[in-house]
Swiss-Prot record:
Organism per entry: Mus musculus (Mouse)
Name of this chain's protein: EMILIN-1
Function recorded in the entry: Involved in elastic and collagen fibers formation. It is required for EFEMP2 deposition into the extracellular matrix, and collagen network assembly and cross-linking via protein-lysine 6-oxidase/LOX activity. May be responsible for anchoring smooth muscle cells to elastic fibers, and may be involved the processes that regulate vessel assembly. Has cell adhesive capacity. May have a function in placenta formation and initial organogenesis and a later role in interstitial connective tissue.
Signal peptide start and end residues: 1-21
Annotated GO biological process: aortic valve morphogenesis; cell adhesion mediated by integrin; cell migration; elastic fiber assembly; extracellular matrix organization; negative regulation of angiogenesis; negative regulation of cell activation; negative regulation of cell migration
Length: 1017
């Protein structure tokens, strides 16, 4: 689509120059012919020169209107900011006061306005993808010998005319057919590679399944399973996923093949192919070229899908390697278990210094008792040998002698194995010998119980041994009576069998040691391989990250491809619709073209740009320089051409950057090929190493099977006396009971370990508590030391003040006395005055004594009882979310004296007439406005708005958008006169109230005092 847009802009420039040239004098030159001769006045019918072959006259400029948005100033608004006042001089720790200052800032709003713009569209009568469909078919036949002229070349994405770097599709039909053939060859090669990868993958999956099944059978069953055995479930799932991915790749390749076939059909016998072949100059087909480019992009996408499938295959291969590593670990663990079963673990005593004396004494006592049991077994063996010898002297050794010896040896091995786990636990106990001294003194009772249990076991074992001795003696006597033969031959035969068994046992021990060394070597090699595999895993993780980034880029390219395909389908539909229309307007367009041709013939102004160094500018102003990769003509509309040149340059830069991005993506994909080769080599080395390890493990298992088979044959040769099977079975049952006892001892040891762990946890807790208390004590001691220093300083200050006060008290603050003045002379006695008026009456005399009390009066009537003080008060909180408008039900009642508040409705009903104190605290969500009204008998009394006061007349100064509320808290507090039956509630108008277990939104009220006058009113 981008090259087509560039061609359209180029045609617009030429059409604009041709339209403006029609108003100049008639003498001139044609801009659209290849020759330089003057045009004849006879019109197109009388002209013998070749007809213009350009398609650039079918674009016209239209003036359109558009609505754009802009931001306008909408007055000012007032904001309040806090201003912290600084402390005065010499007052560093004063309480800072806050002053609030108001500021003015501009307010803006969004407005819309209509502007005009120029837009290039197809002229009337023209249509199609590049406005090439119109009345051109009725203008006359094309000349047979056109004059040579420079052929326009389609520019590439970078702005040059050398062709496209991405696809190379820039010209004629033969070049396009070659490109199609090249793309078909690429598709065929990709199909072959896909089939080869599929075959390799199937072979590897088959070999991997066989190897895994063989390894599992060898470890668990000790034999090879048949070839038709079932594989593991995980392998089937992996194979199904790989087959699905391969099927997806196959479907995409088939889709690309279908598109190539469709494209070939379009080029060979598509619509419009024959008509274009008869023209003088074949014009490149825009839709076919776009289809070829789209096909190339889809091929690149399919390549990326192939790479993604290869990455999935590598990931699956890594998972198979991890499974093989797990199987190797399982094999090593099974071999270790076999080694433990074949040879009992050797007891290893700890050093004498690791245990306390009490534990050593008890352990020695246990060892002594076990030695007694061992001695009893030895005596039993000796007695059995003597009795067998006597029987041989009478009638020879019985035939079941070797079987009895083997059964007794296995019995002794099982008895030793019951002691092995306890010794191994003692050896591997994580507490260590050094911690035994901490918990043994705290558990003497448990050790005594353990000793008692061991004594009972020893007694029971002794009884069973005596019974076993009697049974063996009877069996020996019976066998001696039944069996007969030469004593010398039987002795030699028994000695040979015993010596052969001893040699086999020694050989088995040596071979088991060799097996153990081989297992250690295999384990070391496995660790080395594990390190190598971990490194490969890190490399694969980095590759996976890079492929994820490439997948994101591919997804973006696919989105753009889909958009381009949608636009292409729309344009094809439009082209089909325009192709079906008739040419009814061809006559008018032909007349208009005739007038335009006459005007061009009468034009005498030079429109071409100056070619020589001395040529000056034309009438239309200075000529414009050529665009990047295009040739343009100068004209009178210089500003319009300059604007078009700028827009085309921006488009070319955009496509250049897209081309660079595609080159970088191609480089990255090429680098992935080298990484794939490295991974393939690493995979081959890992597979060879795994095969070598598997071969060694198979050989080792085969040798072990042969050795065990030899041991089983020896045991089968040794056991031929069926009379002792039942008794030895009962003896084995006793050994199983001893195994149960050993399990109980192990449980006791585990319980002691848990108690020790609990004791250590308590010790650690006590240590932490002690450290905390020590820190507190140190802090207290430091505070006491500082307190002593402060008290000393205070005492010194008091002593100093006392000294100063004493000094001040000793000072005399009275001033010096003045001189006494002389006494004055006595005055003369004056004459007596006239008598005055009579004075007021004198005071009353004193009251007389109280008379005797009178008789007792009668008792008055009983007064009215005191009125009870009513108790009316309530307080409730909100614990449920509330965002709908209406009465708020404060459901959590904190206080409700009298029960006059209903928590379900949130309404308080006044029981008495009087003065009531009502208060409420409404807390909303942050930056959300809350509005509420306090209603008395469904009449609003008070209103709160957490956003603050908002004046009327907002329609004169509208606000562009609502500003967030700075606060979300409202408070009611007022005293109301209420009559009996009046209701009080809070109605939510706007916002959402906060709810919590801790009260945030509260409604309270209380009766202050009654008012009877209010009740009468």
């Amino acid at each position: 689509m981008a090259p087509r847009a560039l061609w359209s802009c180029y045609l617009c420039c030429l059409l604009t120059i041709a339209t403006e040239a029609a108003s100049y004098p008639p003498r001139g030159y044609s801009l659209y012919t290849g020759g330089t001769g003057a045009l004849s006045p006879g019109g197109p019918q009388a002209q013998n020169s070749p007809r213009p072959a350009s398609r650039h006259r079918n674009w016209c400029a239209y003036v359109v209107t558009r609505t754009v948005s802009c931001v306008l100033e909408d007055g000012v608004e007032t904001i309040v900011k806090p201003d912290y006042q600084p402390c005065g001089w010499g007052q560093p720790h004063c309480s800072r006061s806050i002053m609030y200052r108001s500021f003015l800032r501009p307010r803006y709003r969004v407005a819309y306005k209509t502007v005009t713009d120029m837009e290039w569209r197809c002229c009337q009568g023209y249509g199609g993808d590049d406005c090439g469909e119109g009345p051109a078919s009725v203008l006359g036949p094309a000349p047979s010998t056109p004059l040579p002229r420079p052929r326009p070349v389609r520019p590439n994405l970078s702005g040059s005319s050398a062709g496209s770097h991405l696809s190379g599709l820039g010209g004629e039909g033969p070049v396009e057919s070659e490109k199609v053939q090249q793309l078909e060859r690429q598709v065929k090669s990709l199909t072959k590679e896909l089939q080869g990868l599929r075959g390799v993958l199937q072979g590897m999956n088959g070999r991997l399944a066989e190897d895994v099944q063989r390894a599992v059978d060898t470890v668990f069953n000790g034999r090879q399973q048949p070839a038709d055995a079932a594989a593991r479930p995980g392998v089937h799932e992996t194979l199904s996923e790989i087959q699905q991915q391969l099927q997806l790749l196959d479907n995409r390749v088939s889709t690309h093949d279908q598109e190539l076939g469709h494209l070939n059909n379009h080029h060979n016998g598509g619509p419009g192919g024959g008509g274009r072949a008869s023209g003088p100059v074949p014009v490149p087909s825009g839709p076919s070229e776009e289809l070829l480019r789209q096909l190339e992009r889809q091929l690149q996408e399919s390549c990326s899908v192939c790479l993604t499938g290869l990455d999935g295959f590598r990931q699956q291969q890594q998972e198979d390697r991890e499974r093989l590593r797990t199987l190797e670990k399982l094999m090593s663990s099974m071999e270790e278990r076999q080694q433990q079963l074949v040879g009992p673990a050797m007891a290893r005593r700890p050093p004498q210094e690791c245990c306390p004396p009490e534990l050593g004494r008890r352990v020695s006592e246990l060892e002594r008792r076990l030695d007694v049991v061992t001695g009893s077994l030895t005596v039993l063996s000796g007695r059995r040998g003597s009795e067998l010898g006597g029987a041989a002297g009478q009638g020879g050794h019985p035939p079941g002698y070797t079987s009895l010896a083997s059964r007794l040896s296995r019995l002794e091995d099982r008895f030793n194995s019951t002691l092995g786990p306890s010794e191994e636990q003692e050896k591997n106990w994580p507490g260590g010998p050094g911690r035994l001294g901490h918990w043994l003194p705290a558990a003497p009772g448990r050790l005594e119980k353990l000793e008692g249990l061991l004594a009972n076991v020893s007694r029971e074992l002794g009884g069973r041994m005596d019974l076993l001795e009697e049974q063996v003696a009877g069996a020996v006597r019976t066998c001696g009576q039944i069996c007969s033969g030469a004593p010398g031959e039987q002795d030699s035969r028994v000695n040979e069998i015993l010596s052969a068994l001893e040699r086999r046992v020694l050989d088995s021990e040596g071979r088991l040691q060799l097996v153990g060394s081989g297992l250690h070597e295999a384990e070391a090699a496995g660790e080395a391989q594990q390190a190598v595999l971990e490194g490969l895993q890190g490399l694969l993780s980095r590759l996976r990250e890079r492929m994820d980034a490439q997948e994101e880029t591919a997804a973006e390219i696919l989105l753009r491809l889909n958009l381009t395909a949608a636009q292409l389908s729309q344009l094809e539909g439009l082209l089909q619709a325009r192709g079906d229309e008739g040419c009814g307007a061809c006559g008018g367009v032909q007349e208009e073209l005739g007038r335009l041709r006459d005007g061009v013939e009468r034009c005498s102004c030079p429109l071409l740009p100056p070619r020589g160094p001395g040529a000056g500018p034309g009438v239309g102003g200075p000529s414009r320089g050529p665009l990047d990769g295009f040739s343009v003509f100068g004209g009178s509309s210089g500003s319009a051409l300059q604007a078009l040149q700028g827009e085309l340059s921006e488009v070319i830069l955009t496509f250049s950057s897209l081309n660079d991005s595609l080159h970088e993506l191609q480089t990255t994909v090429e680098g992935q090929g080298a990484d794939l080769a490295d991974l393939g080599a690493t995979k081959d080395s890992i597979i060879s190493e795994i095969n070598r390890l598997q071969q060694e493990a198979t050989e080792h298992v085969t040798e072990s099977e042969e050795r065990f088979r030899g041991l089983e044959e020896g045991q089968a040769q040794a056991g031929q006396c069926p009379s002792l099977e039942g008794r030895l079975g009962r003896l084995e049952g006793v050994c199983e009971r001893l195994d149960t006892v050993a399990g109980g001892l192990q449980g006791l040891r585990e319980g002691l370990s848990r108690h020790v762990a609990g004791l250590w946890a308590a010790v650690r807790e006590s240590n932490s508590t002690s450290l905390t208390q020590a820190a507190l004590l140190e802090k207290l001691l430091g505070g006491q030391a500082g307190l002593g220093r402060r008290l000393g300083a205070l005492n010194n200050s008091l002593l100093l003040l006392e000294d100063r006060l004493q000094q001040l008290s000793l000072k005399d603050f009275t001033g010096p006395s003045g001189k006494a003045g002389p006494p004055g002379p006595p005055g003369l006695q004056g004459p007596s005055g006239p008598a005055g008026p009579p004075g007021p009456p004198g005071k009353d005399g004193q009251q007389g004594a109280i008379g005797p009390p009178g008789p007792q009066g009668e008792q008055g009537a009983e007064g009215a009882p005191a009125a009870p003080v009513p108790r009316v008060a309530f307080s409730a909180a909100l614990s449920l979310p509330r965002s709908e408008p209406g009465t708020v039900p404060f459901d959590r009642v904190l206080l409700n004296d009298g029960g006059y508040y209903d928590p379900e409705t949130g309404v308080f009903t006044a029981p008495l007439a009087g003065r009531y104190l009502l208060s409420a605290v409404l807390t909303g969500h942050r930056h959300e406005k809350v509005e509420a009204v306090l209603s008395r008998s469904n009449l609003g009394v008070a209103r709160i708005d957490s956003g603050g006061y908002e004046p009327e007349g907002l329609e004169n100064k509208p606000v562009a958008e609502s500003q967030p509320s700075p606060g979300a808290l409202g408070v009611f507090s007022l005293i109301l006169p209420l009559q009996v039956g009046d209701t009080v509630c809070i109605d939510l108008v706007m916002g959402q109230l906060a709810h919590s277990e801790e009260p945030l939104t509260i409604f309270s009220g209380a009766l202050l005092y009654e008012d009877t006058e209010l009740e009468q009113v």
